[in-house]
Amino acid sequence: MCNLLNIEKDPIRVLITGAAGNIGYAIAPMIARGIMLGPDQPMILHLLDIEPASSSLEAVKMELQDSAFPLLKGVIATTNVVEACKDVNIVIMIGGFPRIAGMERKDVMSKNVVIYKAQASALERYASDDCKVLVVANPANTNALILKEFAPSIPEENITCLTRLDHNRALAQLADKLSVPVSSVKNVIVWGNHSSTQYPDTNHATVSTKTGDRPLKELVTDHNWLKNEFIVEVQQRGAAVLRARKQSSAFSAAGAACDHIRDWFLGTPKGTWVSMGVCSDGSYGIPPGLVYSFPVICEKGSWKIVQGLSIDEFSREKMDDSARELAEEKDLAYSCLNV
C-alpha cells in the first residue's frame, strides 16, 4: 500500500541574483541543505549574475552539484535574465551596484534603478504568478520600491526587503548584554530603512526566564544604554564588520535571508514577531507606498503587520526620521527614472 508520507513535494524554483558574490556563495548551500524551506522541500536553484562573473558562477554550480544535496533537484546557472526568471517561485535579489568611495548617492541610485527596472520587467513577464521576492541588495527598501513599480502584476505584499539581519543583530546584542542564549530574547522591532537611520526598538521585547517571559526593560536596567549605545551598535554593525573583514557581511546576511523566507513560508512561532521590510499601508503613521520595516507575524505564506503597539515620543521621532529618509530615497530614485 502506498505510504502517503513518502510522497515527495514538487520542487520550488528559487532564483538568486548576484549568485557568484559572497552572499550568493554563502546562501546557495544553506538553501540546498533545507535551512530556508525545511527538510522535506526539494528545490531547483536558478543562479544569475553578470557576464564578467560567469566563470565564478559556473564554479558555484559545480560546488552545488559536488555537494550532492538530496533536496537539490537541479541548478541553472546563467547570465541571461530571462532564462533565470523563468517560472521561479522565490526570488532572492542580492545583485546590485555597490557604492564605491567617491560616488555620489544619485550615481549609485541611478545604476541600481537600471538594474532593478530590468529585472522587474523580466520577473513581470516570466516568473510564476505567485512569485515572492526578497530584496537584499542596498538600498534594499528603495530597490524593492523600484521592483514594485516595474512588476505591477506581482502583488505588492509579495515584494519585501531584508531587515532581518538588523533584527538578528539586535537580538544578539541584547543576549550578550544579559548573558543569555539569543533564543531567549524575542520581539525586538527594527523600524524603517535598512540604513543608519533604522530604529531597533526594545520597548516590547521579552526575555524567557525560568519563571516565564519577562519584559526586557525589567532585566536591562541601564535604559540609557538601550537608548544610545545599543541603537548605534546595531545601526553601525555592518560598517564594523566591513572594517574588520574588509568585506561586507556575507554568511550572516545569507542566514538572515533564509530566516526571512522560512518564517514567511512556514510561519512565525506563536507569540513571536519578526522584522520585515514591507509596503506600508499607513500603519503607525508611516506614509503609504514606502517600503518600511515593521514588526510582522507570518502564517501560510502571508505576513501581517502587528497592530496596536504603543509608541512613545522617543520611538516616534526615530521612526519618522527613517520614514523621511525613505521618502527622500524614493524621490531620488524616481528622479533617476524621470517618473
Swiss-Prot record:
GO cellular component labels: membrane; plastid
Main location: cytoplasm
Keywords: Cytoplasm, NAD, Oxidoreductase, Tricarboxylic acid cycle
Annotated EC: 1.1.1.37
Cell compartment(s), UniProt: Cytoplasm
Binding-site residues for oxaloacetate, renumbered to this chain: 105, 138, 169, 194, 249
Catalytic machinery residues: 194
Chemical reaction(s) catalysed: (S)-malate + NAD(+) = oxaloacetate + NADH + H(+)
Record GO biological process: malate metabolic process; NADH metabolic process; oxaloacetate metabolic process; tricarboxylic acid cycle
Tissue expression as described in the entry: Expressed in rosette leaves at low levels.
Alphabetized NCBIfam families for the sequence: MalateDH-SF1, MDH_euk_cyt, PRK05442.1
Name this protein carries in UniProt: Malate dehydrogenase 3, cytoplasmic
Species in which this protein is naturally found: Arabidopsis thaliana
Gene name for this UniProt entry: MDH3
